[in-house]
């Protein structure tokens, strides 16, 4: 039986592209959402318009994706509570994972379902929400994704180290309660400023999550592939985890009042494939602005890539919210050969006497 882990040992895994991009291409109306009060609640469309979500998953699988993400980016009680739907969180996660699983099973070769867990709308570090409340909210989502059959949990578009730690804990607790272990992936979002939204650099992210025992640490969203290079290099050189990269289709531009992502598939794919080869990426795909055409362009090149081989050197460090500092003494201590002391070692004294 092929599992995600065995597939990752054999090849570079190809994930899907933007879910939101495909949903908004269908121009959802108030009727699609279920009324003006629910406008913008994309997670609810799994229930309201399941055929849309099915078609999107199918289109990415047909394009060559090995796995798709569930339509659950904001499907936790805190986010859904903004629409008065907190009590629907568990059911929506089960439904989304089950729907993706059903589509995956309709294809011949093994395809996988990745449970998408977004950052939410409240930052723990800035005091928008309490630890216990955020943990409880994520736990509901993790329970639903696992019960729906997700093959892995992806905590994505992370902007806050505190949020990452809470989400990882919620996933661990859910897995322990269900006695079911699935891979746990984390993807940070590094802005054009070079840091996460709250100011953390990628080295601080790595130092903070390294003890958590996750399986993948990567990047997604905010920028195109070119802008991710420096951060991917940091991970490539130091991270003990597999690396994922799901960039946007370039930096968005405003064209006649519309947001446009400038990297078309023929330009996007070579950039991502170059990064995969250069930095030893294990998982690639797309985020905002990417479509099945982008994934199809990637698929042709991914098949030619060898499984990544890296020799990372993780330096023990401590991190603040913003930066990581290596636990290194400079200047280093002077090593003294104390046992080469005739007064302290009879054996050494005898060797000296024997002129040995």
Predicted features along the sequence, with ranges:
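Domain-level signal for soluble alpha/beta catalytic cores
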Residues: 1-356
């Amino acid at each position: 039986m092929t599992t995600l882990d065995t597939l990752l040992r054999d090849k570079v895994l190809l994930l899907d592209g933007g879910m939101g991009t495909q949903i908004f291409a269908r121009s959802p109306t108030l009727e699609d959402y279920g009324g003006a009060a629910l406008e913008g609640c994309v997670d609810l469309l799994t229930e309201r318009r399941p055929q849309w979500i099915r078609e999107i998953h199918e289109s990415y699988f047909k394009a060559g994706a090995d796995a798709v993400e569930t339509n659950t980016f904001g499907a936790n009680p805190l986010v859904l509570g903004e629409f008065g739907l907190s009590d629907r969180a568990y059911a929506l996660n089960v439904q989304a994972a089950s729907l993706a699983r059903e589509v995956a099973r309709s294809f011949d070769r093994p395809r996988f379902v990745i449970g998408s867990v977004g950052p939410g709308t409240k930052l723990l570090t800035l005091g928008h929400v309490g630890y216990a409340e955020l943990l409880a909210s994520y736990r509901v989502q993790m329970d639903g994704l696992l019960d729906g059959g997700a093959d892995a949990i992806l905590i994505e578009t992370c902007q806050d180290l505190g949020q990452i730690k809470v989400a990882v804990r919620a996933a661990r607790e859910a897995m322990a309660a269900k006695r079911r272990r699935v891979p746990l992936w984390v993807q940070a979002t590094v802005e054009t400023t070079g840091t996460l939204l709250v100011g953390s650099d990628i080295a601080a992210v790595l130092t903070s999550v390294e003890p958590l025992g996750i399986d993948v640490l990567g990047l997604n969203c905010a920028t195109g592939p070119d802008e991710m290079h420096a951060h991917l290099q940091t991970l490539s050189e130091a991270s003990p985890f597999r690396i994922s990269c799901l960039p946007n289709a370039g930096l968005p531009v405003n064209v006649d009042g519309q947001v446009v992502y400038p990297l078309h598939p023929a330009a996007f794919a070579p950039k991502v494939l170059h990064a995969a080869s250069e930095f030893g990426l294990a998982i690639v795909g797309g985020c905002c602005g990417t479509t099945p055409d982008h994934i199809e362009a990637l698929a042709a090149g991914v098949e030619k890539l060898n499984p990544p081989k890296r020799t990372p050197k993780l330096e023990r460090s401590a991190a603040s919210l913003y930066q990581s500092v290596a636990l290194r003494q400079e200047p280093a201590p002077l090593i003294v050969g104390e046992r080469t002391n005739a007064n302290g070692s009879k054996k050494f004294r005898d060797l000296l006497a024997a002129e040995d």
